[in-house]
Amino acid sequence: MKEIVLAGGCFWGVEEYMSRIKGIVETKVGYANGIKENPSYKVVCSGTTGHAEACYIKYDESIISLEELLNKFWNIIDPTVLNKQGNDRGTQYRTGIFYLNEKDLNIITESKSREQKNYKKAIVTEVEPLKCFYEAEEYHQKYLKKNPEGYCHIHLD
């Protein structure tokens, strides 16, 4: 099994979208790469912690490759906009690819370079090693499964 953490705006939609992909074994939403230990949603939303709302993904590489997973990720975000996806604004809504394995960096940077050819503006999606990931509160986990009419900036149909 392999792991990656993806930030694509509000984590509810990213988790729901990713959880529907064949080969995804586990998803969890949380707060990635900030400066405060174990922050709450309220504190992250204040914009003072540096965390991004993100989705931890465990996947079976024999079913879906990292390259294929990233292609699906690029389809659900606007990688040229900083700190905004859909109606959500703030540093916690920035886009990012946070890797746990240094060997994945080449695949990620090649994917980002290929994706850049689709845009005139520069892609601002962060590519960084995962420094920290704090699981979000339970009510955020599988939020759109529990609340199918809940807000989502991603078209899931």
Curated annotation (Swiss-Prot):
Gene Ontology biological process terms from the UniProt entry: cellular response to oxidative stress; protein modification process
Keyword list, A-Z: Oxidoreductase
Any one GO cellular component localisation term in the record: cytoplasm
GO molecular function, one term: L-methionine-(S)-S-oxide reductase activity
Origin: domain of life: Bacteria
Recorded catalytic activity of this chain's protein: L-methionyl-[protein] + [thioredoxin]-disulfide + H2O = L-methionyl-(S)-S-oxide-[protein] + [thioredoxin]-dithiol; [thioredoxin]-disulfide + L-methionine + H2O = L-methionine (S)-S-oxide + [thioredoxin]-dithiol
Residue numbers annotated as active site: 10
EC number: 1.8.4.11
Family: Belongs to the MsrA Met sulfoxide reductase family.
Known function: Has an important function as a repair enzyme for proteins that have been inactivated by oxidation. Catalyzes the reversible oxidation-reduction of methionine sulfoxide in proteins to methionine.
Protein name (Swiss-Prot/TrEMBL): Peptide methionine sulfoxide reductase MsrA
